[in-house]
Design a protein with these regions (language model features):
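Helix N-cap at the start of a conserved alpha-helix in ABC-type nucleotide-binding domains
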Residues: 162-164
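Helix-to-loop junction immediately C-terminal to a conserved catalytic motif
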Residues: 48
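Conserved ABC ATPase signature
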Residues: 126-130
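Catalytic Walker B motif of ABC-type/P-loop ATPase nucleotide-binding domains
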Residues: 151-155
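Conserved ABC ATPase "signature" region
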Residues: 104-122
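H-loop/switch region of ABC-family ATPase nucleotide-binding domains
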Residues: 186-187
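H-loop (His-switch) and adjacent beta-strand-loop-beta switch element
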Residues: 195-213
Length: 224
């Protein structure tokens, strides 16, 4: 469980989000939405522990879990001489001995991850040969094989086509059904309404947080 006690996200002393109070329950699935520049990605980085809160408190109960993280802008350079399988296997590194290498179970997990995103046939291709959509699928497979209890996704569908977006969305739903907690920054209101039970909507002054349907209804009323 993640508890936000008057949490304000931002950079240094510059507050970007309003103060947030609430709880993200273990096993929940939450979309963070709002206009560009309202602090969605900043909040997600704060929840992940990459940024300290400007003010307020972030509490983990019972303790901070391992996080599967998919950034909006990846830091992995496609010029590196890595294969698709190399990158996906990085998700298993926390559970792998440096001296023993990848055991059968880990190799099976990597193969499953590649299969789930439709990249099994490209496992040994170097990453500089991938299209943008294939690259995003590879990074998502890395998160999937990690099997972290908490998964944070920052704009996972940016720059990819509809078919790839839906493929990844189906994998996110499966991860949630398996008991993983999902927090995702999204712009796609249709997918939020269809798949995410809980929504946190940010704007410059206030936040709406709760079941997706009521939050969406309030937003439509404000826009009318």
């Amino acid at each position: 469980m993640i508890e936000l006690d008057h949490l304000v996200a931002g950079y240094d002393r510059l507050a970007i989000t309003p103060a947030l109070c609430g709880t993200l329950a273990r096993g929940s699935m939450t979309a963070i939405v709002g206009a560009n520049g309202c602090g969605k990605s900043t909040l997600l980085k704060t929840l992940a522990g990459f940024l300290p809160p400007v003010s307020g408190v972030l509490r983990w109960q019972p303790a901070r879990p391992t996080i599967g993280w998919l950034a909006q802008r990846h830091a992995l350079e496609s010029q590196f001489p890595l294969t698709v399988q190399d990158v996906v296997s990085m998700g298993c590194w926390p559970r792998v001995s440096l001296f023993r290498g990848l055991n059968r179970d880990v190799r099976s997990r990597i193969a499953q991850g590649l299969e789930r995103v439709g990249l099994a046939a490209m496992a040994r291709e170097t990453i500089d040969t991938l299209s943008g959509g294939q690259f995003q699928r590879m990074l998502f497979a890395r998160v999937w094989v990690q099997n972290a209890p908490l998964v944070m996704l920052d704009e996972p569908f940016t720059g990819i086509d509809e078919a790839t977006s839906q493929l990844l969305m189906e994998q996110i739903v499966d991860m949630h059904r398996a008991g993983q907690t999902i927090i995702a920054v999204l712009h796609d209101s249709e997918r939020v309404s269809r798949y995410f039970p809980q929504t946190l909507r940010l704007d410059e002054r206030v936040a709406q947080w709760g079941a997706t349907a009521p939050v969406a209804a309030k937003d439509e009323a404000c826009s009318a």
